[in-house]
Regions:
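Hydrophobic protein-protein interaction segments
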Residues: 1-86, 90
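Signature of lipid phosphatidyltransferase scaffolds
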Residues: 82-111
Length: 111
């Protein structure tokens, strides 16, 4: 299960060949995800996605994804960069941020 938030839809834009491979792999492995998105019409590579939208516009080139003990921070710019951190404590810390965002966005959407 992957969780994340930020500048979604950029993988297809900056790495279109890898995007096709990634999308196919996720479908074959039945990988699910909970993403907090900036735009409702962004292309998401995963098939089984639960998505909520931030209630305000956030201008960012950064995307954070967490999977198992891995945290990947993408910097989507002319030459994309990423930092991969393989550490369970770091992944759990980012997971806690995601839980807080997700809970508060659920509360906003119920009003």
């Amino acid at each position: 299960h992957v969780i994340g938030w930020g500048a979604e839809g950029q993988l297809q834009r900056y790495m279109p060949h890898y995007y096709k491979f990634f999308k196919k792999t996720c479908k074959q492995r039945n990988i699910t995800a909970d993403f907090i998105v900036l735009k409702t019409n962004s292309p998401l590579a995963l098939v089984n996605v639960n998505a909520l939208q931030f209630p305000v516009h956030i201008d960012t080139c950064v995307e954070v994804n967490i999977y198992k003990e891995k945290t990947i921070i993408f910097f989507w710019k002319e030459v994309p960069e990423a930092i991969e951190i393989i550490d369970q404590n770091v992944a759990d810390s980012f997971r806690n941020y995601h839980k807080m965002f997700w809970k508060n966005l659920h509360q906003v959407s119920k009003q």
